Amino acid sequence: MVTEKKMVSEKEKMVKLIFTYGTLKQGFSNHVLLQDLITTGDALFIGNYKTHLNYPLVCGPYRVPFLINLPGSGQKVIGELYAVSSSGLSRLDELEGITRSHYQRLPIQLSPLDHQDDDDDGVVLTAGEAYFAHSSYAGKLWNKNGRQGLVGYTEEVARGYVKRKDRPQDRTFMDHIRSFLESQ
C-alpha cells in the first residue's frame, strides 16, 4: 500500500515535466527506460497530452521520430507527460544525445488530450519540456519530409523503425542524419 506521505515525497523530488511523443511512449521500444524510472521512483506518468501549438512531427532515418521547434507549423502533436527526477532527467538526456547535439530539450506548452481545441475558456496550460530535433539539422529534416507533419507517432507510422542496436555500428547518429538528408 502506498502511503500519502510516500506519494508526496516522490512528487517533491520530480524536477521536470517531460512530454514524450515517440519511442519513449507506452508500447514503443524505448519505453522500457521510463518503466525503469517509474520502478525506481524517478518518473511518474501524468497523462495523455497534446501540444498547445502546432509543431512538426516527422520521421528521419530508421523511422526515428523528431519534433521540430517550428511552432505554428505542422499539427498539434499527441503524446504522454511524465514527471521526472533529476536522476531520471539525466538518463533521458543521455538516451536523447543532448550532449552530442542529437536532440535539444526545450520548453513546450501542453494541454490535456481530452481538452477541446475550440474551447479555450478555462483551459490550464501545462509547461513542460520536450526533446526536439537539434537546430543544426531540424529545418532540413522538415524540408526532407515535404513540410508535412504527423499528429502522432503510432504503430503504423513506426513500422520499419530500427532499434539503435540493430543499426550499422560503424556510423554515428549524426552520420545517419546526414545520409538521410542527402538521399533522394
Where are these regions (language model features)?
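Glycine-aromatic micro-motifs
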Residues: V2-Q184
